[in-house]
Every structure is written in structure tokens, then in C-alpha cells.
């Protein structure tokens, strides 16, 4: 579903962003405005820095990284480091909508808190929207303003506490 919303999979859905239909926007513009973070991030170059056209040191710092991380070899990154850096890469593009698929699944509690704090701050500052997919019910209670769930009956909604 997230890939379809991000216009990465062929679909017949009708989606709009601030009143503009996806079909009326060039795909590259849509994908700049609607940022997707997959459960497993993709890395195609040898060093971390090659993946960051615009480096925002404050984002890296908030996720627990020093500037030297940009010189690191991608192959040496742990799954948690890859996930946090993929989030930094996504946020550096400043999308209006975040589609996050299990963004903290590979993270320790300290890194999870950092990610939650960074994303929530980003949403407030940019007045952005977020669809955050997770199985962590305690996390849902901490971050959600609205909760949707899928079960055998389909899509449901419950109030956030």
C-alpha cells in the first residue's frame, strides 16, 4: 500500500496532495513531495556520503551520527545504522508526506527514541503528514494522533490516547 501511495507500484488508486491529484503532477515531483522509507533501505554506492545530495548535519546528529559517517563504507553499516541513515536521506529531501514502513524495527531503544523525536519534530516544523506502519503497539500509543489498523475484517480506525 505504501509503495502505491508513493507512486512506485502501478495502481488504479486516486490520491491527492493538498488538493492536487497525483495524475496532474509529474511522477518525479510527486515522489519528491511524498517520501517513502521502506522496511529495508536500498544502497547503491560504496560510501554513505554518495547517497546524500544535500547533507544536513543536524539530522545526522539527532540520529546519533558524527559527520564522519559520510565517509563510511555502506557494507560496514549495521541494519539499524542503515535504517537511521535512510531516514536522514529521506528527510534531507524535505517531503510534505512521510510514508514510513517499520522505521524503527531494527533499532535499539535509544535509537528508537531518537527516530520518534526527529520525525515528530519534523512533522511539526514542516506541517507535514505521516503514515507510519508499525507492529509496536507501545510506539503507536506514543506517536499516533489517529490509528488505523488492518485485520480480517478490513481497515478499521480507533482513537489515539
Residue ranges and their predicted role:
Residues 5-6:
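Helix-to-loop junction immediately C-terminal to a conserved catalytic motif
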Residues 73-77, 81:
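Conserved ABC ATPase signature
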Residues 87:
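Hydrophobic anchor residue at the start of the ABC signature
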Residues 98-102:
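Catalytic Walker B motif of ABC-type/P-loop ATPase nucleotide-binding domains
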Residues 109-111:
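Helix N-cap at the start of a conserved alpha-helix in ABC-type nucleotide-binding domains
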Residues 133-135:
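H-loop/switch region of ABC-family ATPase nucleotide-binding domains
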Amino acid at each position: 500500500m505504501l509503495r502505491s501511495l508513493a507512486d512506485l507500484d502501478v495502481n488504479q488508486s486516486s490520491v491527492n496532495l493538498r488538493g492536487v491529484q497525483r495524475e496532474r503532477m509529474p511522477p518525479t515531483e510527486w515522489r519528491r513531495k511524498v517520501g517513502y522509507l521502506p522496511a529495508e533501505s536500498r544502497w547503491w554506492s560504496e560510501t554513505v556520503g554518495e547517497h546524500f545530495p544535500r547533507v544536513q548535519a543536524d539530522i545526522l546528529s539527532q540520529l546519533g551520527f558524527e559527520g564522519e559517517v559520510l565517509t563510511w563504507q555502506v557494507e560496514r553499516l549495521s541494519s539499524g545504522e542503515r535504517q537511521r541513515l535512510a531516514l536522514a536521506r529521506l528527510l534531507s529531501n524535505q517531503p510534505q508526506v512521510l510514508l514510513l514502513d517499520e522505521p524503527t524495527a531494527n533499532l535499539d531503544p535509544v535509537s528508537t527514541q531518537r527516530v520518534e523525536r526527529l520525525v515528530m519534530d519534523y512533522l511539526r516544523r514542516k506541517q507535514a503528514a505521516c503514515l507510519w506502519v508499525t507492529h509496536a503497539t507501545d510506539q503507536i500509543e506514543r506517536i499516533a494522533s489517529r490509528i488505523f489498523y488492518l485485520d480480517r475484517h478490513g481497515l478499521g480506525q480507533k482513537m489515539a490516547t
